[in-house]
Amino acid sequence: SRAPGGCPWDAEQTHESLAPYLVEEAHEVLDAIAGGDRGHLAEELGDILLQVVFHARVAEEAGESAFDIDTVAGLLVDKLVRRHPHVFADGDASTPAEVEAAWESIKAVEKAGVGGDDYRADLLHGIPTSLPGGLAADKVLARVRRRGLTPDPDAVARVERARAALAAAESEVRAALEGLQR
């Protein structure tokens, strides 16, 4: 608890100091999914929820523009309603592919209002700079396919070579870590 008399470690945390824990917890959720243990998954999802609540509390205590857990939940509800007109309004989407296409279209309109009219043209727009390179490459290449674009083959080849190098480096790091256990 961050309340007076609560945990001193909790009390000194900031969004920045908590960021690595959020990333770590997300990876633990992925491991739990891959492991197929639903009890472990539930536990790890609880840890993600703790991160959300913790960040909201930090913001609330800092007086950051009335940002608290209610704000976070309200923004989520608003987004879900906006992006599901086939559920909450008179939109029509009867297949998962139609739902995904509608979601992307609505998201593009939202982002264009925030970031300018070039949202659809900018393949990197909205991709977090902190997203690992391999995942960023996957997202950009998926956008290219969805938009029916024909990218420069040399650029695609460079991306693929870089992804292969990343995978090799990741394998090397994992092998080195295994060596620490001996």
Residue ranges and their predicted role:
Residues 1-44, 50-182:
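Flexible "arm" and connector segments at domain edges
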